[in-house]
Amino acid sequence: MEGGAMRGMFTCGVIDVMQEAGITFDGAIGVSAGAVLGCNYKSEQIGRAYRYTRQYCKDYRYGSMKSFRKTGNAYDVDFCYHEIPEKLDVFDKEAFKANPMIFYAVATDVVTGKAVYHKCSDGEREDIEWLR
C-alpha cells in the first residue's frame, strides 16, 4: 500500500471497500502512510483509519507545524502511535494476530538507502515502531 500522507486516505477507502466485499489476500506490504493505515486491513477494522483521521485531523498533535515545533516531529509520536491506538480508537491487536495474512512494513535504511522489510506479526510495540 502506498505512502504519501493524504493519499493514504484513498488507500483507506479502497481497503474498506475490499473488506466489505470480503476480498482477502495472503499478504500485504505498506510503506509510510500505507503501513500506518494498512495495518487496519489485517486487523479487519473497517472504517477505523478514516474515522480517527477525521476525528483528530484538527488536533495539532495529529499533525502540524505546532507539533513539529514542540516535539521535533510533524506528527506527535506519543499521541499518534500510542494514545490513539491504545486509548482513543483502540487498535485490535488480537484480530491483527489472528488474521493469517502476512503484513510487512517497509522503511528505508538511512545508511544503505535500501528498503528494509519488517514482518509485523502481533501489532505490539516493535511493530508500532516500524509503522511510524
List each language-model region with its residue ranges:
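Patatin-like phospholipase
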Residues: 2-87, 117-132
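A short alpha-helix-loop-beta-strand transition element characteristic
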Residues: 88-102
